C-alpha cells in the first residue's frame, strides 16, 4: 500500500482529471512586452494637450515595432498589441485624434498610462499559476498551455484491485 504516488510527466491532452504533483510556474512575463491596448497613436502624455498637433514619425505594428525612441512632440501610429516605442507612455485612441497634413491632433488629452498594457502586468516569470494537489479540469489545461508547458508532473494514478475470496471481499 503506497501512501504517496510517484510523479509522472503528463501531456496536455491527458491532463483532465489528473492531480498536479508540483506547482505550475509561469515560464515568462505576460504580456511579454509593454504594448498598446487600442489602435491609435503612441506618444508622451505630457505632449498631448487637447488641440495639440504632434509630428507623426512612423508606425508600430504587431511584429514590426517602431525602433527609434520617441522624442518630445512626436507620435507613432500604433496597432492593438504592438510594442510601445521607447519614450511613449500613453495611447491616444483613434477616436480621440484627427490625422492632418502637419501631423496628428489630440482631440482629448490622454493620461500617462492610458491604454498601455505593461510587461508582466498579468503574469510574472516564476509566478505560481496552479498549485500541487490541484485536480486539473479544462480551465487548468488552458492555463498550463498558455504558460507554455507541453507536459506537467502529475501524481501517478492509483492501481486498485478487488480480490474475491469466497463469500467475502478482501
What positions do the PLM features span?
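Short, low-complexity N-terminal leaders and the immediately following helix N-cap/first helix
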Residues: 1-50, 54, 118
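Short, glycine/charged-enriched hinge/interface segments at domain edges or termini
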Residues: 42-170
Amino acid at each position: 500500500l503506497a501512501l504517496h504516488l510517484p510523479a509522472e510527466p503528463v501531456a496536455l491532452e491527458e491532463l483532465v482529471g489528473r492531480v498536479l504533483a508540483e506547482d505550475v510556474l509561469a515560464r515568462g512575463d505576460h504580456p511579454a512586452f509593454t504594448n498598446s491596448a487600442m489602435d491609435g497613436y503612441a506618444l508622451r502624455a505630457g505632449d498631448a494637450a487637447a488641440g495639440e498637433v504632434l509630428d507623426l514619425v512612423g508606425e508600430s505594428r504587431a511584429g514590426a515595432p517602431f525602433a527609434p525612441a520617441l522624442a518630445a512632440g512626436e507620435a507613432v501610429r500604433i496597432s492593438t498589441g504592438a510594442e510601445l516605442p521607447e519614450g511613449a507612455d500613453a495611447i491616444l485612441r483613434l477616436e480621440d485624434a484627427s490625422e492632418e497634413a502637419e501631423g496628428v491632433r489630440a482631440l482629448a488629452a490622454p493620461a500617462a498610462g492610458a491604454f498601455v498594457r505593461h510587461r508582466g502586468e498579468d503574469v510574472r516569470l516564476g509566478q505560481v499559476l496552479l498549485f500541487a494537489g490541484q485536480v486539473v479540469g479544462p480551465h487548468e489545461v488552458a492555463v498550463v498551455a498558455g504558460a507554455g508547458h507541453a507536459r506537467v508532473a502529475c501524481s501517478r494514478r492509483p492501481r486498485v484491485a478487488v480480490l474475491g475470496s469466497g463469500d467475502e471481499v478482501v
